[in-house]
Amino acid sequence: MVIEETIAELVLNGRTLVRAGCLPDSLEDFALGFLASEGLIAGPEAVASLSVSPDSRRIEVRAAVDPDLLVAFRERLALSTGCGRGASAAAENLPQVASDAWFTPDDLLDRMKDMDAAAALFRETGGVHAAAATDGPTLLAFAEDLGRHNAVDKVIGRCLRQKIPLAGLAILSTGRLSADVLTKAARAGVPVVVSRGAVTSLAIQLAGPADIATAGFARARKMNVYTAPWRLGLAER
């Protein structure tokens, strides 16, 4: 099976914001999640309209966005490097996540297994990443995409569209947890991020002050916890 890829152009208020190589599905979720995870909107109530072209190559969004936030986004985008085609890699001074949520390691490891079980396209092709959102006992959202950033954006967007509060969720990912993914979680207000892969030093550095729990190599019945262990019931707050 050959994976279908498209270049989707996200247009905000008549101006191109970003172009992303992605799977041509759940693009409404992707757009909403991207805007939230880049700090441009607080939630779906800021969006007046959102439409996807029939060929899945153009996503048109009309939304109330603070001009200063848009300027800051474009400055970050100009500085960003690597495969994170968003602007998150240049993040500094992230806000502390306002959440009292915590999770048990057993629940998170169980949900990682659920995410892997749901990853049908990966099993068929071996060419996509998966991401999911959980409240602990339940897997609430799931997405696959060519890029780990896109998959995370789709999950965040789906939760926003379903009015699921992000402050009570953990994001799970099959991809490396780097600074750009961590900053997406922070700007969206997600308190816990768990990866099946590695966590980078800059992600750990940014997660500590933001009070985000980060964990990597979550496989079988083990994980490495790097920051905010209280959110996994492993320390006092």
Functional labels for PLM-detected ranges:
Residues A133-T134, Y226-A228:
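Short beta-strand-to-turn element immediately C-terminal to the catalytic PLP-Schiff-base lysine
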Residues E38-G39, A87, A119, C159, ...:
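Structural signal for hydrophobic packing residues in well-ordered secondary-structure cores
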